Amino acid sequence: MKKGFRGTGTVERVDFPNKGIAVTDDGDRVIVKNTIPGQKVEFVVNKVKHQRAEGRLMEVIEKSPLETEEPCPHFGMCGGCTYQTVPYEKQLDMKLTQVKKLISDAIGTEKESGYEFIGIHGSPKKSEYRNKMEFSFGDEYKDGPLALGMHKRGSFYDLVTVSDCQIVDEDFRTILKATLDYFSKNNIPYFHRATHKGYLRHLLVRKATKTGEIIVDLVTTTQTEGFNEEELLAGFRYALLTRHYDGIFKGVLHTKNDSVADVVKNEGTEVLYGDSYFYEELLGLKFKITPFSFFQTNSLGAEVLYETAREFILGDDKDSLNGKTVYDLYSGTGTIAQLMAPVCKEVVGVEIVEEAVCAAKENAALNGLDNCKFIAGDVLKVLDEIEEKPDYIILDPPRDGIHPKAIGKIIEYGVENMVYISCKPTSLARDLQIFMGRGYRVEKICCVDMFPNTYHVETIVLIQKRNS
């Protein structure tokens, strides 16, 4: 099969991440993304490497027997959701199967390696579950009207105005519509990624699930030719605050970003209304969140994730960490560190993002926790500098997993138990191979679905020292 070949096939399975395996009438297998098991699809081969062909999806010729009617009018055009036409229980089955395959390919099956795979916990909410969205300004086609939403599937430039997005609640949709209407009427140009000209870049919206508090951050360039920015922003603030919301508006902000890269970047933020932060609650703790704070985007799902992790850590003995020191490596804003603090002597969190460390310290103080210590720095370097030795280690690394040298240092501590929380099962499978080759074994595994209708999945693993 050569590059440029156009063919059809039936998708027999989908591997992580979002890689459909389509089988042609001749028995050839082609990887086609954004597909669902059982679909008959047309594809064009765009890559052939080591006798392995990858194709771009051109058309779904026949729907899968698994599929139902899509609840979102943007599905198929928007690049946000992939499994929205699949019933939720089947989505969970697909994700569980994908993770099980990756783990068993890496370290053996449950029977071969002796671990227990508990299954998968679903999200408490299947729709309207997100507490944060980053919308982009642009157009839906070249020289078309202003758009505000998500990138079209497979497109770097074109957008879909997701005014009826189903993974956020009505307040998000109201804010999007109010913003788009206002700037469209004022003929304000968006920042063009090719010419690097224009004003409007992104709209960042956050809403706490538990408290209902909302903040909005408009991200623009400093290119203000042709209009009075102060008057424009005052009008924007008015356009937002005069709409009806179920939640409580806590702040409207304006962030400047002249970076060429198409990412939300903070080069200076001003408050147009209210505060620059809001509060969310998680498992009885309170967290102060700014527009750029890292915080799990599904608050109710995060409670399931962290409660499951806490059960893995403590087991049947709720006093097992009394008088002990816990390392929380890649600790982010210190959520899990603060959840463990009441049951241990001390928690030491290590995180490379300095702003996240500042937030962790502030939130620990907010929750009255004086036995949390947070250190800003690379885990690989900080482990050489910490004097306290851990009795237990919690690992919650970024998507790429743990640096091999850092794994070596972690193993040298020789702790009896560790819990690994992973947001990318391919990285997890690779890292588990290293742990198992260095005197540890996998005791049990559980998946948690934090992102319904997408291919993303979280996995929690209890790792134990052999003969412990």
Where are the model-predicted features located?
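Short, conserved phosphate/pyrophosphate- and ester-handling motifs at nucleotide-, phospho-/glycolipid
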Residues: G38, V168, N298
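Terminal RNA-binding accessory module
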Residues: M1-H74, K111, R153, K373, ...
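Short, solvent-exposed loop/turn elements at beta->coil junctions and helix N-caps
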Residues: I118-K126, R193, L200-H202, C447-M450
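Structural signature of eukaryotic scaffold interfaces centered on beta-propeller domains
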Residues: R206-A208
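Internal alpha/beta scaffold segment
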Residues: Y157-R201, T222-H254
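Short, acidic/hydrophobic/Gly-rich beta-strand patch recurrent on exposed beta strands
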Residues: G20-D25, G149-K152, D217-V219, A360
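Rossmann-like S-adenosyl-L-methionine
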Residues: M1-G7, R13-P17, T222-S468
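Extended interfacial segments that mediate partner engagement and assembly in macromolecular machines
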Residues: E59-E70, G79-Y190, K210
